[in-house]
Amino acid sequence: MIVADHGRDFAPDQYVDLSAYRVPCVIYAPGIVPPGRLSTVCSQTDVAPTVLGLLGGEFDHGFFGRNLLAAPSGEGFAFAYVNDMLGWVSGRRAVVLMPDRPPMLFRITDSGQDPASETEIAAELPPLREKMLSIYGVASRLYDEVRYCSPEKAATVVRRPE
C-alpha cells in the first residue's frame, strides 16, 4: 500500500478548497486485490484497518477507520482539519466550519467543489452539520478517555498529562 501524507498546498484562511485534501492511495497486491478503483469517500484513518484486512484473520484494533476492501461502496466520510478549519466530506456533500464564518456547504464534483445553493443549504446543512459534529465528538471523546480499545489494552496506554 502506498499512500501520500497530504494533497497539494492550500490556504484555508483565504479559501476553503477541499480538493487540496484528496490524497492518492494505491494498493498493489497481485492475486490478492483485483485491479479497480474505489468510489467511496475514505481517509487516512482507513489505512491501518485496510492493511490488517489484507493480512487476513481477526484483529482487535482501536482505529476509527474501516477496511476499505470490505466496506460497502458509496459509504464513508473523511475529516479535514487544519488551523481552525474543520471540514467533513460524506458522499457528494461537504460541510466546512471556520471561526467567525457561517457554516458552509459544498457539492463535491469530479473536478472539485461548488458552493451549495441557498435552498440546499437550508434543507441539508443542519442535519449534515449535526452528523459531522456527532462523529467528531464521539471520536474525540473515545480518544481522550482511551475507550477506543479493549479495557485490557487501555490499561497499557500512556495517557497525556492533564
For each predicted feature, which ranges?
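Solvent-exposed soluble domains appended to multi-pass membrane proteins
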Residues: 1-162
